[in-house]
Regions:
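N-terminal Rossmann NAD(P)H-binding glycine-rich loop of SDR-like oxidoreductase domains
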Residues: 3-23
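SDR active-site strand-loop-helix element
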Residues: 6, 30, 68-69, 110-116, ...
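Rossmann-fold NAD(P)-dependent oxidoreductase module
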Residues: 15, 19, 100, 148
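NAD(P)-dependent short-chain dehydrogenase/reductase
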Residues: 153, 157-160, 164-181
Length: 181
């Protein structure tokens, strides 16, 4: 199966690409720079159809699209400029993928990232996926992100994954802290 993946250089994306390839799937990382090999495809998030001809061509034959794009929420402080980056790195990419699906036909499955921040600060409450949206910057961002993803063609099974902080023994914040313990 051909799988297009955004956010392929992130913690989850790196592992997903490796697992897909180990399973014999054709995983293609969508990148915002020039592609380095046949396993990468350059695209322009927020770009026009003319700027994304290669994306449209790949989308026509993709079995699945996995959208993990987004600047890390672990970087502090969240200045106005960084909040803008958090927004643009998610919403623009997602809209570009949905627009491509609408133009050329779509993959069978669209898995799009979101965040547990959708629920806001609920204290110690136990939450289920049907819990109402919370309030605050992350809740607003996650809600907008999901809304765009749900604009994919109705023929596409759209799955939203609300992840929280992802930990790894070798990467990210935990990877940097473990050697100190």
């Amino acid at each position: 199966v051909k799988v297009l993946v955004t956010g392929a250089s992130g913690l989850v994306g790196t592992e997903l690409i490796a697992q897909l390839r180990a399973n014999g799937d054709h995983a293609i990382a969508l990148v915002r720079r020039a592609a380095k090999n046949e396993n990468e495809l350059a695209y322009v998030p927020g770009g026009t159809a003319e700027q994304n001809v290669a994306l449209d061509a790949a989308m026509k034959t993709a079995g699945a699209v996995v959208n993990l794009a987004g600047a890390t929420t672990g970087k502090l402080p969240w200045t106005k400029a960084y909040k803008r980056e958090l927004i643009e790195s998610r919403l623009g990419v997602t809209q570009t993928l949905v627009d491509s699906m609408k133009r050329v036909g779509a993959a069978t499955v669209f898995v799009s990232g979101s965040a547990s921040g959708f629920y806001g600060d609920t204290g110690d409450a136990n939450l289920h996926e049907d819990a109402p949206r919370g309030s605050g910057f992350l809740a607003d961002l996650a809600s907008q992100w999901e809304s765009i993803a749900l604009g994919a063609p109705k023929s596409v099974r759209t799955v939203l994954i609300r992840t929280t902080m992802v930990c790894s023994r070798t990467k990210g914040a935990l990877g940097r802290l473990l050697p100190l313990l």
